[in-house]
Swiss-Prot record:
Pathway: Cofactor biosynthesis; NAD(+) biosynthesis; NAD(+) from nicotinamide D-ribonucleotide: step 1/1
UniProt subcellular location: Cytoplasm
Protein name per its UniProtKB record: Nicotinamide-nucleotide adenylyltransferase
Gene Ontology MF annotations: ATP binding; nicotinamide-nucleotide adenylyltransferase activity
CC terms in the record's Gene Ontology section: cytoplasm
Keyword Disulfide bond appears in the UniProt entry: no
Reaction(s) catalysed by this chain's protein: beta-nicotinamide D-ribonucleotide + ATP + H(+) = diphosphate + NAD(+)
Length: 179
């Protein structure tokens, strides 16, 4: 009997933070594939308003969430940016296990993988009005409720690392401090 080749998908995002929309996308991808590689993009950035969390913190957010969901068929790979788009796919390939299909809604990522002959699929965004990293970070800074927008393990990690205090402090200017 011939064995079936495992079908492995690739998804990349900054996950600043990992939210319920990301979780739904992971579940949808896994409904069509045997496993998923989740690339933690812009892994070298942290401690800014746009990228407040480290790659390690994002790794914790994702792995704890997937464990709670009883999802075990995944790989988490931090991927630093390469400031040469023509080299980026090779960079990703060097860091990850082989994959068959790429899921992205990012036009540049789509183009780069298509040029390398990958099958690229998009997924519908889930509750995009509320579940975006930008919107969630804005809520954190403003002191608005954000906890319902992310899975419970993400809330726990953010509290463990004092993430709310961090992002609020990062959102201030030196003029705010001297007043």
């Amino acid at each position: 009997m011939e064995s079936r080749k495992e079908k492995r998908a690739f998804l990349i995002g900054r996950f600043q933070p990992f939210h319920k929309g990301h979780l739904e996308i992971v579940k949808r991808i896994l409904s069509e594939n045997d496993s998923i590689i989740i690339g933690i993009g812009s892994a070298q950035y942290s401690h800014t308003v746009v990228n407040p969390f480290t790659a390690g913190e994002r790794h914790l957010m994702i792995s704890r969430t997937l464990e709670k969901e009883r999802i075990y068929n995944y790989y988490l790979v931090p991927i630093e940016d390469v400031n040469a788009n023509s080299l980026w796919v090779s960079h990703v390939e060097a860091l990850t296990p082989k994959f068959d299909i790429v899921y992205t809604n990012n036009p540049l990522v789509r183009r780069l993988f298509m040029e390398r002959k990958y099958e690229v699929r998009s997924l519908p965004m889930v509750n995009r009005k509320e579940w975006t990293g930008t919107k969630i970070r804005e809520k954190m800074i403003a002191g608005e409720p954000w906890e319902n927008d992310v899975p419970d393990p993400v809330v726990e990690v953010i509290h463990e690392i004092d993430g709310i205090s961090r992002i609020r402090q990062l959102s201030t200017t030196d003029e705010d401090i001297t007043q």
